[in-house]
């Protein structure tokens, strides 16, 4: 009976409030050996891809300190539904990122995106700070062809005003493709957990990230 009960309870952590589809697009233009400018677009759709949950537009500037260390400054304009799924708001974010990369072994790379965000809501006095830390492990299997490798990542959100973690995004498995010389496509499954005022919300996410570099 205990074994049967355990098997019945096993799927409970996998239950989710809904499924989302994310389409993300990165465009970078290199100005010289160190400086690049770009733009990031993000569209997130709710259950059955019927309703827009979030959209983001974000012009960016990147500076390569070394081949294995980048600094980045973003200004993001977005509209999103809150964690409790009760209200929609416009946000303006100023973001500073530190992005180190470590070569672990042949074909294995560990990278981090550490981001500090200053956030304003609806252009008013609602202002706050948030920290996001995302380690990512890439496994490169091929240097040519469409399929290039696999990756996994986990991102933690910490809100300084609430003094607690408010979101987690786990990608247990993603696929890296190279459809063109300057284009990379990442397809992923993401388990998203957000913390509202009274409870955690969970979502299954299927996503695609297109990156173009010139």
Predicted regions and their residues:
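Hydrophobic h-region of N-terminal signal peptides that target proteins for export
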Residues: 7-16
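Gram-negative (and chloroplast) outer-membrane scaffold detector with strong preference
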Residues: 60-142
